């Protein structure tokens, strides 16, 4: 019998599913982990539907947020590793952000349960060092 359907058979006429288009998210197309669609939705709600938002604006903003998050998490992970613990706490985030000059100027917010950075005024340190040097000279 002629007019066979091939190996796949069915209604496709033996052509298979090679022409079926798979859907890919904006995040996957851009190679990002953060959700571009959700960021775009938040942009729309923030502007209250009055401002037009370009197609690539949400992708760009998502990439910036992902980069900043990766940077902070890397520094906080290093701080946790230095303290020999395996879990990042708000204290590690605080140490990471305040330890980096650029992140410190960018993120001026108070981090809950972050504590404070240890700091001794230079004038106090100089007096202590001068006393130690004076004691060494006399001896």
From Swiss-Prot:
Annotated GO biological process: heterochromatin formation
PTM info: Acetylated once deposited into chromatin.
Compositional bias of kind Gly residues: 1-13
Subcellular location: Nucleus; Chromosome
Pfam families the UniProt entry points to: Histone (PF00125), Histone_H2A_C (PF16211)
Molecular function in Gene Ontology: DNA binding; protein heterodimerization activity; structural constituent of chromatin
Keywords: Acetylation, Chromosome, DNA-binding, Nucleosome core, Nucleus
Residues with the N6-acetyllysine modification: 5, 11
Domain of life according to the entry: Eukaryota
Entry GO terms, CC: nucleosome; nucleus
Family matches, as InterPro entries: Histone-fold (IPR009072), Histone_H2A (IPR002119), Histone_H2A/H2B/H3 (IPR007125), Histone_H2A_C (IPR032454)
Region feature Disordered, mapped onto this chain: 1-28
Principal location: nucleus
Functional description taken from the UniProt entry: Variant histone H2A which can replace H2A in some nucleosomes. Nucleosomes wrap and compact DNA into chromatin, limiting DNA accessibility to the cellular machineries which require DNA as a template. Histones thereby play a central role in transcription regulation, DNA repair, DNA replication and chromosomal stability. DNA accessibility is regulated via a complex set of post-translational modifications of histones, also called histone code, and nucleosome remodeling.
Subunit and partners: The nucleosome is a histone octamer containing two molecules each of H2A, H2B, H3 and H4 assembled in one H3-H4 heterotetramer and two H2A-H2B heterodimers. The octamer wraps approximately 147 bp of DNA. H2A or its variant H2A.Z forms a heterodimer with H2B. H2A.Z associates with the VPS72/SWC2 subunit of the SWR1 chromatin remodeling complex. Also interacts with RBP1/DNA-directed RNA polymerase II largest subunit.
Homology family: Belongs to the histone H2A family.
Protein name as annotated: Histone H2A.Z
Name of the gene: HTZ1
